[in-house]
C-alpha cells in the first residue's frame, strides 16, 4: 500500500495544501481511511492519462450513504501528468460524495486535470481541490458537471512560485431542479504569474447555477496577469 511504501512523502504533503478550516475538507480529513496517491518523480513524463473512477451504488430502500474519497498528487520537478477523475452513481437512494483532491506541483511541472461529475440525480456531490504550484509550474483544470442533484465544485489555487500558469475551466449542464455551484479562489502569491478562468453552462427547466470566483493578488506579486 502507498501508505507504507511512500509514508514519508504522504506525511510530508497530505494536508499541506488543503484548507482544514473549511468544514467539508475537515470532515473528509477526519473520516479519511483510504484514497489515491499519485507521485510523479522528477523529470518523468507519464504518457498515458491516469484515470480515477469513484462509483457509488445503491438499491431502492437502501440507507443513504456518505463517501469521502481523498486524492493526493505530487508532481516532481520537470514532470508531466494528465489526470482524469470521474464520479458516478446508480440507484434512486440519495447519498453524499465529499471528495478532497490535493495537488502539489514542483518547479516546471505540468499537470493537466479533468474532473467529470455524473452522480445520480438524487445525490449530493461536494468536491474540493487544493493546489500548491511551484516555480514555473503549469496547471490546467477542466471541471465538467453532467449530473447530480446538488453539485458543488470548489477550487483553491495557490500560485506559490514565480512564473506559474494556472488555468481553470468549467462546463455544466443541468435540468429539472438541480443545482450546480462552482467556487474558485486563485491566490497570486508570487510575481510573474498568469491565471485564466472560463466557466460556461446550459440550464433548463428550474435548474440553477452559481459561480463565485475570487482572485487575490499579494502586494509583492508584481506583473501578475489575470484573464477572466
Question: Where do the PLM segments sit?
Answer:
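Conserved beta-strand/loop scaffold segments within soluble protein domains that form the structured core
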Residues: 2-226
